[in-house]
Amino acid sequence: MTDTPETLSGTECNGDRPPENGQQPSSQTRQETTDADETQAYYKVEPSLEDLPAKENQEETGNTKGNILPKGPEDEKILNENPEENLFVVHQAIKDLSLQEISAEDMAFREGHPWKKIPPNSSNLEVSRQKERTAQQQLEQRGDASTTEIEWLGFQKSRPVDILHSKCDEEEEEEEEVWNEEINEEDVDECAEEEDEVRVIEFKRKHREGSPLKEESLAREDSPLGSPGSQPGTPDEQPVFGKKGDIARNSYSRYNTISYRKIRKGNTKQRIDEFESMMHL
C-alpha cells in the first residue's frame, strides 16, 4: 500500500479524480502513459528541412526513445507487467519516426534538392550500373551487326572525315578541270595566232618572191609590144611549139597577163591587132 499515495498525488496534479471502487492505480497509469505516447506520436507536425536540420532530427529521435524508456520504479513495474503492450508502443514510435523521415524526404524532393539530401543506396547504384552496362553491350552488338552486314554487301559506312575528304577531292577536281579548260582555250588561241602569223609570213615571202618574176615577165612582154605597129621578132628568135594546143594555151596565158590588160584600155583596133599578132605567134 506504499505505492498508492504516489499515484494519487500524480492524478491530483493532473486534475483527475481519485480512484473509486478499489481500482488498481497501476492500470490507470499504464493507460495514461499509452494515451500520452499515442497523442504525442500523432500530434506532431511534419517538419520542413529548413526549420529542422539533421541534428534536431537526431535529438527528437533521442527524446522519443527516452520517453519510451522507463523513468522511475513505477514505469519499470508497468513494463514488466505488460510486455506485449510495450512492444506495440515501441513499434508505433518507430513507425512514427519512419513517417517523419519520409515526409522530410518528400519535402526535400518538392523543394528541388532530392539528390543532395538523399544519398543513393549501394544496391541502387549497382542496379543502375548493371543497366548501363547492358545498354552499352546492346549498342555495341547492334553496331557490330550493322558493320558485318555492310561488309557482306561490300559497302562501308561514310564517316564524317571521309565525307570531308571526298568533298575536298571533288572541289580540287573541279578546279583542275576549270584550269585545264582555260589552258586548252589559251593554247587554241595561241595556235590560231601562230597559224595566222605563219600565213602572213608565207604570204609576204610569196609576195616578195613573186615581185621580181612579175617584173621580168612584164619587161619581156613590153619589149615586143612597145608600139602598135611593131612586128614580131625573127623566126630564129621565136620559140618552136610542137602543137596548136600549146600555142593556144600560151596565147591564153599571155592574154590574161597584166600587160594585155593594160593594152585593152586602148582603142578597139589596137586591141584587135594585138590579139591577132599574139595568135600568129
UniProtKB/Swiss-Prot annotation:
Keyword Ribosomal protein listed: no
Segments of skewed composition (Basic and acidic residues): 198-223
Annotated compartments: Cytoplasm, Cytoskeleton
Modified residues (Phosphothreonine): T234
Composition skew (Acidic residues), residue ranges: 169-197
Sample GO molecular function, one term: actin filament binding
Stretch list, region Disordered: 1-80, 110-147, 167-248
Record-listed Phosphoserine modification sites: S211, S223, S227, S230
Keywords tagged on the record: Actin-binding, Cytoplasm, Cytoskeleton, Phosphoprotein
GO biological process: actin filament organization; morphogenesis of a branching structure; regulation of cell projection organization; regulation of cell shape
Database matches in InterPro entries: Ermin, Moesin_tail_sf
One GO cellular component, as annotated: neuronal cell body
Pfam family, one: Ermin
Main location: cytoplasm
Chain segments carrying region Binds actin: 262-281
Tissue: Brain and spinal cord. Exclusively expressed by the oligodendrocytes. Appears at a late stage during myelination, and in the mature nerves, it is localized to the outer cytoplasmic lip of the myelin sheath and the paranodal loops.
Biased composition regions of type Polar residues, renumbered to the chain: 1-12, 21-31, 135-147
Subunit structure: Binds actin.
Protein task: Plays a role in cytoskeletal rearrangements during the late wrapping and/or compaction phases of myelinogenesis as well as in maintenance and stability of myelin sheath in the adult. May play an important role in late-stage oligodendroglia maturation, myelin/Ranvier node formation during CNS development, and in the maintenance and plasticity of related structures in the mature CNS.
Protein name: Ermin
Organism of this sequence: Mus musculus (Mouse)
